[in-house]
Each structure stands twice: as structure tokens, then as C-alpha cells.
């Protein structure tokens, strides 16, 4: 819109009401500035709408957000007509914590990144890679912080965590817990689906922390839920970077350190292989003003582009 382009947007079929409200707000802004309302168009529907938009030659650029599987389908459809795509797909975002990290800042970035929006952001923190020298201190502080989390109605400002979006998301959460158990992970904070009058929807879950080896299969998958995988590294920063980069996804990443050399290494071409790299902030929440996008199985292209 800012550049004068018409946008047709299709939201997730799980959030039709949110999209209608957003479209109404956009429409009011357009009207106030004497811009035709058709500059922003909303189409609600299932995957068939997405297929139609991907195949339409009237749409030169398709920006798609979703799973890696979905992104491959969109890429094929748009590529068949030589169109352009921006793909923001799965994320498996990690924070590296070095011996020189500020512990308070680490806790703030990690907890917000892992449990904010109930772990349902593409940039949510999924993995915490901690140096052995500060591992126990970080682990103890993290458990203490999780024990203070309040779960409930997201419209109540006293609560920190709301529900997962639907029962399908709850099933994915429970399946990930089962895989952690089968693969030998150790629960530091156990997850569960909450019940009772406050949680009558059946979609409220407890944020969980599992102590794991970085090689576990479940750790290499994105679980769109508040499950954090805690793992240890030893030696220099390059060892932590190798663990971070070994997954297929490459959206957001962060390092907690007061060591300038470590930070520069992380940001360099031999550092993080993600589209977004942060220093002394978490993986989630600070990216809105920048060129947004990922690498590897997260797709390609950048929202906002080089102008950001």
C-alpha cells in the first residue's frame, strides 16, 4: 500500500474475524486519505483460495506465510507462470547464551520469546543453547521464571499466556511431548492441557521446558506451541553456532553476550545462517521494523525489502 500497490490478502481460515477487523481499520485509513477502498481487498476461505491466487497471472507477486510444505506448493504454482514469491515458512529459532551473557536480559528475551502468544509466532524461541559454564544458573533461573507464569484469558492483563488457537494445535503440542518422552528428553517444567472453568475451551496448555540433546529428531522440527528445548554446548562460540545452524529452518536467531568478538562472529558470514540475527534481545518481537524473512526451509525473500 505504501508504494501504491493493490493488495489482495487471504488470512488463515482459522482467523476470519481478526482479518475482517483489520480490513475495516485499513479501509478507514484509505477513506480518510481519499484512496479507493479496492487498494486493499480481503478474501476469506480455505486452501482453494490460496491456490487460485497462486495461479492467477493478474497477481505478479505472491507473499505467503505458513508451513514449509505449503510454501513448496505455492512456489511451484507461482513459478509455473514465472511469477515472484516471498515465502516465510517454518521457523526453529534459537538463542545462544555465552558465559559473558547478562542473565537478566537472557531471561527476559527467552521467556517472552518462548511463551509469548503461547508460542504461536513464527519467530517464537524454540531452542536455548547455553554454555556449560552458566548452564546450571540459566536452568535454575528459567525454571523459577516459568513457575511464575499466569495462564488464562488473554484479555486479562494479569495473565501472561493465553490459549492455543484450536484443538488441532493442542494435538500437535501433545504429540511433541510424546516424542520428547520417546526420544529421551528430560522435563524440567512438564507440559499439560489445562482443564476447569477457566480453561473450558480445552485449548489452554502449560508452557514446558525439556532438557535435551541437540540431535533429537523432535528438536529439528517446529512445534507451534510453548515448548522450549534447553541444551548445552562447550568450547567456543563456533560450537554453539554449529548447533544452531544444523536444523533445516533459518528464520530468526539471537545471541546473548557482552563479548563484542562473539557478537561480531555471530553476525558475520560464518555465523548465524538465519534471515534475522539479534544481539542481546530475543528471537521474537524486534523484527517488525526490518527486512523480514528467512533462509533454507524457511523460504526466501524479504518483507519490507531493502528499504527497511
Predicted features, each with a name:
Residues 3, 56, 81, 176, ...:
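Structured helix-beta-strand junction loops
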Residues 28, 61, 69-214, 238, ...:
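ALDH superfamily catalytic-core signature
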Residues 46, 65, 113, 257, ...:
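Conserved residues at the C-terminal ends of beta-strands
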Residues 1-105:
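Rossmann-like NAD(P) dinucleotide-binding subdomain of oxidoreductase/dehydrogenase enzymes
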Residues 6, 47, 68-69, 73, ...:
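Gly/Ser/Thr-rich beta-alpha loop segments that engage phosphate groups in nucleotides
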Residues 9-12, 43, 64, 96, ...:
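Active-site-adjacent beta-strand anchor residues
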Residues 31, 54-55, 79, 115, ...:
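Residue-level signal for alpha-helix termini/capping positions
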